[in-house]
Amino acid sequence: MDFQHRPGGKTGSGGVASSSESNRDRRERLRQLALETIDINKDPYFMKNHLGSYECKLCLTLHNNEGSYLAHTQGKKHQTNLARRAAKEAKEAPAQPAPEKVKVEVKKFVKIGRPGYKVTKQRDTEMGQQSLLFQIDYPEIAEGIMPRHRFMSAYEQRIEPPDRRWQYLLMAAEPYETIAFKVPSREIDKAEGKFWTHWNRETKQFFLQFHFKMEKPPAPPSLPAGPPGVKRPPPPLMNGLPPRPPLPESLPPPPPGGLPLPPMPPSGPAPSGPPGPPQLPPPAPGVHPPAPVVHPPASGVHPPAPGVHPPAPGVHPPAPVVHPPASGVHPPAPGVHPPAPGVHPPAPGVHPPAPGVHPPPSAGVHPQAPVVHPPAPAVHPQAPGVHPTPAVHPQAPGVHPPAPGVHPPAPGIHPQPPGVHPPPPGVHPPAPGVHPQPPGVHPSNPGVHPPTPMPPMLRPPLPSEGPGNIPPPPPTN
């Protein structure tokens, strides 16, 4: 027989197992599983004979291996024989007598009533511990009987509804009825000297005394300590008034020189809202600001304000390039701020000061306080409420300012075009770039900004410029 080329075979695998080999392997697996759950050695009907086979003494069957016997024990025949054997043994077994119960003999006697009693409440003078003293009279107690006692809870008795606040102390002695005393349900102190009983055989009196344990007084409730950094709630109000705020740890040192103490900071919450404008410190006590001294102008020339230095003679800054707008409203000169609200322009007919000469301070305007910082270098301060005007030489009517990119003449040299005469003496020319206006017309309204000058390419030509001054149009591609 060819064992190498059988169908389904694989070289080196030993060939395909036959059906008998598969059954043998299956039975061995089942036997191993049965041995894990059933101990064959403890089976009273399992027996191995001298031939090496296995027998069932209950069913008288023969088995070649352990697996066969285990399969037999789970079969119907073996289970039926087990039930029949159990019924037979139960029928033949003798009936065993039931165990006798221990019987307690109940004493039978005629009750003659309740005994007399006396209860005394006591308190320890040193510790304040409470106690009860019971005295029970048994004059007709039976011979050889000693009174007995016990504590009973409220749930053991059947006379009253159970109440956990009370307990009962029972006293019993023949032939008297059992009596009970209702006491508070507190822990009993059974230490030596705190709980004792005494039976006097001569007087036939029974004494019992016990003490209640001391109850610790409840501690005052204390606020729990919160985590660090968390403040405790404020104390309650006393008489409807909040407690005083804590005093500061240290007061600020007194100022030197005997000056008055600064005001204390307010203890209430800080006021909310935007901060106000900065205020100047008040003048020292007893010092009044000097009154303004106004001198009359001499021959149309206004003197400068006190403390103001005039510019150096012969130094004139270049005139700025200002294009007059097309409308009839002229902007102020460069560097000249429009008047603040509430400050009116000069009345008509009042001439501005000459170049380089500063106007006097207005009447009713106080000079600056000594705490005002000095002006920046090369800037001359003016009286309060009056804005400075740059010292610019006026130009004759019809003379245009230099174009952008053209350097001004050197300081001290003032070229004049031919045919233009300087103004007569005593007549003050207007500021550069500012055209005189008729009386009753204000130079600018407070709070109204001048219009932005238009570039030369967009504004219309002025009559003074003439057709020759119009810039050429931009080249086209």
UniProtKB/Swiss-Prot annotation:
Q: What is this protein called?
A: Splicing factor 3A subunit 2
* Acetylation listed as a keyword: yes
State the encoding gene.
SF3A2
Pfam entry (one):
zf-met
Give the originating organism: Bos taurus (Bovine)
UniProt region (Disordered), positions on chain: 1-27, 217-477
Give the compositionally biased regions (Low complexity): 379-398
Q: Which GO terms describe its molecular function?
A: nucleic acid binding; zinc ion binding
Q: Where is the composition biased (Pro residues)?
A: 217-295, 303-323, 331-362, 399-441, 448-477
